[in-house]
């Protein structure tokens, strides 16, 4: 079975073709980073308009890359939420229309289920059960995963997501949008221990997160210590260490609570090298294993949507006959496979 995946939930247009026998046949991605850079963040209307311009040409490019025609596609998967409503509607409308024209089923995919399943695209995919850390600009969640669609929320951020905190702190440090990856690069030049940031909510029981206070702490630290290059690098290092330590502490608790030996990291922040190293060390000490996707599949992409849609279609998911999206969509509401 070959599935065309369409991802348009935010500021990246991702198109891919996944085959249940041959694996990933095509992967096309267009990023709107330059479009939104002058505004310091994603402008929803601009994002939607750009998806309108880019989605169909990228679908054509993906089919060409895979050396396929429309007749070779057996199903269409599109991101139906969560995300920006206008951006979601572009992908959903195009996906549903193509499926109708091609006479194949269309299936709506949960964006975060796509991220959660992205490590399944690798040569060494995780087996169930596992704890999943979904960590991105919009979400920071710990999920108990016992099967496809069998998700139990263990904890989540009560304010800013980790990726959002990275971007906001990067802006305080004078870095351009999107600043998270640049903050991590700057942190590599920072001295460990010059500044010590708090590890929020680690001094109390539970698995929830809070990252908004770290941004305030960073602002106060910058104000009190100047803004020369080395100081900025040292602050970036202290901030990143605090976020990584906090995530590791909570993941360890989640593994202890569930008794699972496997941890899956997904979402844009899961590409962070410091985070990967920290989690690998923690899992090694526990006799467990950590899994994550290659960096290009940590951020938004069509491959994860194509794969998640394939799994849903093969399990007998009812094809969608209408176009509907859900800007807010709890992961726990998904049906089990």
UniProtKB/Swiss-Prot annotation:
Its cofactor is Fe(2+). It is found in: Cytoplasm. Fe cation binds at residues 111, 115, 300. Binds 1 Fe(2+) ion per subunit. PROSITE patterns: GLYCOPROTEASE (PS01016). InterPro entries: ATPase_NBD, Gcp-like_dom, KAE1/TsaD, Peptidase_M22_CS, TsaD. PANTHER family: TRNA N6-ADENOSINE THREONYLCARBAMOYLTRANSFERASE, TRNA N6-ADENOSINE THREONYLCARBAMOYLTRANSFERASE, MITOCHONDRIAL. This is tRNA N6-adenosine threonylcarbamoyltransferase. GO terms for cellular component: cytoplasm. It catalyses: L-threonylcarbamoyladenylate + adenosine(37) in tRNA = N(6)-L-threonylcarbamoyladenosine(37) in tRNA + AMP + H(+). The lineage of its organism: Bacteria, Pseudomonadati, Pseudomonadota, Gammaproteobacteria, Enterobacterales. It comes from Serratia proteamaculans (strain 568). Transmembrane segments: none annotated. Belongs to the KAE1 / TsaD family. Its EC number is 2.3.1.234. Keywords: Acyltransferase, Cytoplasm, Iron, Metal-binding, Transferase, tRNA processing. Substrate binds at residues 134-138, 167, 180, 272. It comes from the Bacteria. GO terms for biological process: tRNA threonylcarbamoyladenosine modification. Required for the formation of a threonylcarbamoyl group on adenosine at position 37 (t(6)A37) in tRNAs that read codons beginning with adenine. Is involved in the transfer of the threonylcarbamoyl moiety of threonylcarbamoyl-AMP (TC-AMP) to the N6 group of A37, together with TsaE and TsaB. TsaD likely plays a direct catalytic role in this reaction. GO terms for molecular function: iron ion binding; N(6)-L-threonylcarbamoyladenine synthase activity.
